[in-house]
Design a protein with these regions (language model features):
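Terminal, non-globular segments
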Residues: 1-174
């Protein structure tokens, strides 16, 4: 085992432990519960991994931790894993080809991803089945969840940027 391989293995195990801890915090009842609304912490963490490590690693993290979220979600199984995969691959490719890797861009990517996820959950979970008078639900539950999750994307961005800098080999730093 080479030193570079051990460093990468330790880096991705550290990433996995952080995202798993975010999942545990996300699914613990009453923890980070603001007026009955809990943020989705796994998605911003996976998007930050995709931004700093590329679309392949981000897509894998998004898919596998999306499966974790599917196991505790009220949506159909596979909804979160498919969306997290698409969002993370898009975030990784967007930072390679379109955007700079700045904190503001990462936060905007997280905001867009969580907003799109909430709109799709609202559509496929409620509108498609013909429930009526659900506009207040969107504004009182899903809207604040989008804002709360976006606020938590800032610490994740700083944490993963710091970790990426610590684990990056000296020969590849620019």
């Amino acid at each position: 085992m080479t030193k570079l391989f051990r460093r990468r293995l330790l880096k991705f195990l550290t990433y996995a432990m952080i995202v798993f801890c975010a999942y545990i915090i996300q699914t613990t009842p009453g923890l980070f519960d603001f007026f009955g609304i809990q943020p989705i912490l796994v998605l911003p963490a996976c998007i930050c991994i995709a931004v700093y490590e590329g679309e392949f690693a981000g897509g894998l993290f998004g898919f596998f931790f999306g499966l974790f979220c599917d196991s505790t979600s009220e949506t159909i199984f596979g909804f979160n894993s498919l969306l997290f995969l698409v969002f993370c691959v898009f975030a990784g490719l967007a930072t390679i080809y379109l955007f700079r890797r700045s904190t503001m861009n990462i936060m905007l990517l997280c905001l867009g991803a969580i907003f799109l996820r909430s709109v799709l959950e609202y559509f496929f979970g409620f509108i498609l089945f013909g429930y009526e008078n659900l506009v207040p639900f969107f504004y009182t539950r899903l809207g604040p969840q989008v804002v709360l999750t976006s606020l938590f994307s800032f610490p994740f961005c700083l944490l993963f940027r710091w970790l990426h800098g610590k684990f990056e080999p000296e020969t590849t730093k620019v």
